[in-house]
Amino acid sequence: MATPHHSRRGSMAYYPRVRAKRIQGDIRSWPEIEGQTKVQAFAGYKVGMTHIQMVDYRKNSVTAGQVIMAPVTVVEVPPLTVMSIRYYARGDNGLEVISEEWAENIDKDVLRRINKINRHKKGIEVKDVDDVRLMVHTNPQLVSGVPSKTPEIFEIRIGGSTIENRIKYAKERLGSNISFSDFSKPGNFVDVIAVTKGKGFQGVVKRFGVKLLPRKNRKHRRMIGTLGPWHPDWVRNTVPQAGQVGFHQRTIHNIRIIKFDTKDHVDDINVKGGFLNYGIVRNDYVLLFGSVPGPAKRLIKMRDPARQTRPAVESIEVTYVSRESKQGD
């Protein structure tokens, strides 16, 4: 009998490996924060990647204080519009909506998503409210790289301080726009929630990374050696099989914000010939360290970190941003 020499191929941590329900990621949990009242998430459109040179801010690094090169992802973050406020109370089945408060003027493009707006406002008392969230929508018409005019609608939790301050914060912003600076700043960490690139129906080698069978194997090499033993007489879910690859929702924890700038300085980031499959940036933008899930043009969401292990830094000095063409010339 052959001697086992390798652990199982592929992780069982992400099951079932099926397509995400929606093309935008869903924020399923919110960390508790202390300090000033603020929104705990934001959304933007993935533009592409480039590289920068910056002063190494890590005190214990061998290159501390020196100029190093780093890969970054460019995310265009136009303002989000607050269309309503939702008040939650904790019930037997978790948080339940007890009242909503809508803005007076709603963008006509929002009606592409919502058929009817119920403006009936139910009176509430502060003592009955356990959580306050903003219902916001994106403004894709501001983004030249995204052809859609239909806005995406989602909730953003308001955190920090007391419930009274959160309600006041929400009412001050009802019907107006919020920017990325209301959410976070360079040097802080965020969790990125997005849907990955879709790869379609793929075999076991690409999907799980199983080993190719020997060259003289009958019929095929890119297959598994066996579906399992005679008994139990069913195929177990641990056996690698062909199926969907990609288009899964994933959360990447603790991604550092390297830089944030307004639309007045987009010339500092736009590359020659425009970003591949996107074009040029026209709105506020943010640089995130490393890569994030999804292709260009996809909406990604950024949330306050749920498992921050390293401290934030006050500022990051960026000395150079590559604006060379990404067209492969």
Curated annotation (Swiss-Prot):
GO BP term, pick one: translation
GO CC annotation: cytosolic large ribosomal subunit
Pfam families the UniProt entry points to: Ribosomal_L3
Gene Ontology molecular function, alphabetical: rRNA binding; structural constituent of ribosome
Superkingdom of origin: Archaea
Keyword vocabulary terms for this entry: Ribonucleoprotein, Ribosomal protein, RNA-binding, rRNA-binding
KW Lyase (keyword) present: no
Role according to the record: One of the primary rRNA binding proteins, it binds directly near the 3'-end of the 23S rRNA, where it nucleates assembly of the 50S subunit.
Description of how the protein assembles with itself and partners: Part of the 50S ribosomal subunit. Forms a cluster with proteins L14 and L24e.
Family label: Belongs to the universal ribosomal protein uL3 family.
NCBIfam families noted in UniProt: L3_arch, PRK04231.1
Name of the protein: Large ribosomal subunit protein uL3
Organism: Picrophilus torridus (strain ATCC 700027 / DSM 9790 / JCM 10055 / NBRC 100828 / KAW 2/3)
Gene label: rpl3
